[in-house]
Amino acid sequence: MQNQQIRIRLKAFDHRLIDQSTQEIVETAKRTGAQVRGPIPLPTRKERFTVLVSPHVNKDARDQYEIRTHKRVLDIVQPTDKTVDALMKLDLAAGVEVQISLG
């Protein structure tokens, strides 16, 4: 595992949840002796929806909704076996999607 690099991508709708999960991952990796690059905030995706409020006429009556998807990237350089084990056992928040890739 010495020449490997672990890239962790996090996605969430709530920025506080993603920051908390990122902090937990960074603390776990540093505690096990790995070097961490990041967290790097990626651009937030804003998805907007416009809904007609009126069931029949009145095109002027509309509501607009927005969903923001926050993203972060972490690189763990030169992870040890302890680092991988600790990351596998880590329990993160339910609203955070985690993608892990080795490279």
UniProtKB/Swiss-Prot annotation:
HAMAP family, alphabetized: Ribosomal_uS10
The keyword Mitochondrion is annotated on this UniProt entry: no
Gene Ontology, cellular component aspect: ribonucleoprotein complex; ribosome
Family assignment from sequence similarity: Belongs to the universal ribosomal protein uS10 family.
Name assigned to this protein: Small ribosomal subunit protein uS10
Keywords: Ribonucleoprotein, Ribosomal protein
Gene name tied to this protein: rpsJ
Summary of subunit composition and partner proteins: Part of the 30S ribosomal subunit.
Transmembrane segments: none
InterPro entries for this protein: Ribosomal_uS10, Ribosomal_uS10_CS, Ribosomal_uS10_dom, Ribosomal_uS10_dom_sf
Gene3D superfamilies the UniProt entry points to: Ribosomal protein S10 domain
NCBIfam families: PRK00596.1, rpsJ_bact
Function: Involved in the binding of tRNA to the ribosomes.
SMART domains: Ribosomal_S10
Gene Ontology BP, a term: translation
One GO molecular-function entry: structural constituent of ribosome
